[in-house]
Amino acid sequence: VPQIRLIGIATLLLASGHAFAANVRLQVEGLSGALQKNVRAQLSTIESDEVTPDRRFRARVDDAIRDGLKALGYYEPTIEFDLRPPPAKGRQVLIARVSPGEPVRIGGTDVILRGGARTDHDYLDLLKTRPATGTVLNHHDYDSFKKSLTNVALRKGYFDSKFNKSQLGVALDRHQAFWDIDYDSGTRYRFGEVTFEGSQIRDEYLQNLVPFKEGDYYQTKDLAELNRRLSATGWFNSVIVAPEFEKSRKTKVLPLHGVVSPRTENTIETGVGYSTDVGPRVKASWKKPWMNSYGHSLITNASISAPEQQLDFSYKVPLLKNPLEQYYLVQGGLKRTDLNDTEADSTTLAVSRYWDLSSGWQRAINLRWSLDHFTQGNVTNTTMLLYPGVMISRTRSRGGLMPTWGDSQRYSIDYSNTAWGSDVDFSVLQAQNVWIRTLADRHRFVARGNLGWIETGDFDKVPPDLRFFAGGDRSIRGYKYKSISPKDDDGKLKGASKLATGSLEYQYNVTGKWWGATFIDSGEAVSDIRRSDFKTGAGVGVRWQSPVGPIKLDLAVPIGDKDEHGLQFYIGLGPEL
């Protein structure tokens, strides 16, 4: 019987505790701003069902409040508890009334730097961030300062750095705090020899990817840049370049050792897609990321749709002096087109020299050869061309596959002359731009502009691929793909020698990865600028931020066109830049 009675009492006490927990709410009064925020963070570990009015719980709350205030320089708060009766429909409230008291203020910050830190501007700049005398003590400032000293050491190669002393002293009777730090950075390490293991590419090509010289001071950004460059070549499946510390303790010269593994020699990709401009499309690509020890690579692509069938290749030859940023590109292909009033068979071959600059700009000079047999409207021709050109471009973006910020710019000039065997003289100038900006995360703006100009004395001999047509996605929505250009006497499209199109689009993030869009496109494709014929289309659309890039659906109609009235829809997948 006594055992039964004890069990009953224990059960009653447990039930009573749960009843209190379920009927008591904690409330802290007297704090605001950073003090309130920090105390709330300390109390956030307390679950609502743990709140009770007993002495043990009050002591727990008292400790948490004091810890939160102490971190911000308030060492002597006054804390009083009061249990408020429940309202008509509610729970009892355990109130903690807090008076922070007088804060502890900085009385001095004594920081001694030894070793290379005495003359290193990054360390000297850190000294300027110390709190001024009289500032309220903040433990985070002290801890952050010490962490910053360590971060500079790791970033710049002071691998023997240490704290001889680091104390935060508090004199409560004077309400003052004192920093006392004695820090020795030691000697700064330098880069040593860089070696590689597992590479199928000649060592001299890899050495010319190293962005620093042996003997340069160590910096983590240089090591990261080396890893990035090796990965960016596309030659390797994995890249790890790491310091060999055990070989450098005495000399302070840090050798690096890179372990790489070759990328698969052959990759084949196939896909089926759809776009409104060309309809269903089958694509295949064969990629050889490296073909020999000189790092040559090959990409072959095939694309088949109802209006266009194309087979092309691109052979890349990196230059020894700068394999990543300077290279030759040999390109060629076959293309057949049967679209609107265009029928064409084209064979092309081009040799280009590229410079990919660290600023992000890409420059190229090229020499192209092409043989085109085509019918455009009522005119049939066979044209052989040999023409040089120059191109400069840059693409920047932030925010992943659906950038929140970015721009793409491309400018090119091509020149053909019968003096070296071309069938026609011409000059072609083109400029293409896209800008993306986002405001307040939910408002996205996309602007596009395209300009083109052909100067020639025999336009009929210019192949359709060099002529300008407008209409369709990324041009003037509301019109069919490449349906805007001057027409001949029979009403067939001829293509234009002048092009100007622009687009403004606003997108709003409706929810999650879904965006709504509204847009207006305008422009013209003409051969005589004195006979301006601007076309305008406007519409609405939906964007879905898929894992492989934005997928879009647009509906658009022509504006103010007496000959075109129909609704056009556009489906597309791919980058906007």
Predicted regions and their residues:
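Gram-negative/organellar outer-membrane beta-barrel architecture
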Residues: 116-122, 219-410, 437, 474-478, ...
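Bacterial N-terminal signal peptides that target proteins for export
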Residues: 1-8
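C-terminal outer-membrane beta-barrel translocator/porin domains of Gram-negative envelope proteins
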Residues: 232, 373-381, 385-510, 518-522, ...
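Extended hydrophobic-aromatic, low-complexity segments
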Residues: 191-192, 204-206, 239, 267-270, ...
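C-terminal structured "cap/appendage" subdomains that terminate the fold
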Residues: 523-527, 531-552, 559-563, 567-569
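N-terminal signal peptide c-region/cleavage motif recognized by signal peptidases
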Residues: 16-19
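Periplasmic polypeptide-binding modules associated with outer-membrane biogenesis and secretion
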Residues: 21-34, 41-276, 285, 299-317, ...
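Flexible, surface-exposed loop regions and adjacent strand-edge segments
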Residues: 113, 196-200, 276, 345-350, ...
